[in-house]
C-alpha cells in the first residue's frame, strides 16, 4: 500500500471518498474484485464514489488489440465508447463482458459486444457511431496520464482519496479480503458510519443478470449451505437457472432485467 497524490491531475474534489479502480478486463483477480466493489457500493453507497478505469498499460492494450479484428471488438475502445452514455452503464457493460470472457474463456466477438451493450441499457446505434470517433483514443491517453501520475503498475489496483484534494491517496495493489477495504474507508472517514443492507437475493440477481457463487457469498456472507438452499428455491420458481462453466458454476436470471438508470 502506498500514498499517491492526485494534486497534479486536475481532478475536482468531492464530498465523499473517491476510489479509482484500475482493471484489466481479462484478469480473474479483477473479476473477483468486482464482487468486493459491488458490496462496498451497496454497504457504503452514501460515503463512496467508485470510478472504474481500464488500465491503459501497454500489456493490457496489447491484449485488447490481439483479441480484436476491428475497433468494434476492441474492448478498450468499446468501454470508452460505452462511457459516453454514462459511467454506470459502462461499468455494467464491462461486468457483463467479464461474465462472458473470463468463466467461459471466450474470444471477444462483435455479437458478444452487441449483446452486452444492449443488456447494459446502452443505445447500440449511438454506440456504433461513437466507436468511430477519434476522441476515444484521446480519452485513453487521459487515462494513461492518470495511471502514470498514480504510478499504477498492475491490475487490479485501487486508489482511495478523502475529500481533501491536497491529501495523498492510498494505493492498494492486488486483491485483499473485504475487511481490508472497509477498514480503509472507515479510517478515511474518521467517524462512525452506518452500513446499508444488501437487497433481496432475488433482486440482486435480477439486477446483475449473471452472478458467481463467490460473488453471492461475498455480498451476503451467508453459510454456503443456506445460500444454495435459497438459490434452489429461486430455481424451482423458474426465476434463475444454474450454468456450468470451466471456472465454476454461475446463476443466471430468467427474470426481466432491471433497466439501468
UniProtKB/Swiss-Prot annotation:
The lineage of its organism: Bacteria, Bacillati, Bacillota, Bacilli, Bacillales. It is found in: Cytoplasm. The gene is spxH. Pfam families: Thioredoxin_5 (PF13743). This is ClpXP adapter protein SpxH. InterPro entries: Adapter_SpxH, Thioredoxin-like_sf. The keyword Cytoplasm applies. Keywords: Cytoplasm. Its main location: cytoplasm. Belongs to the SpxH family.
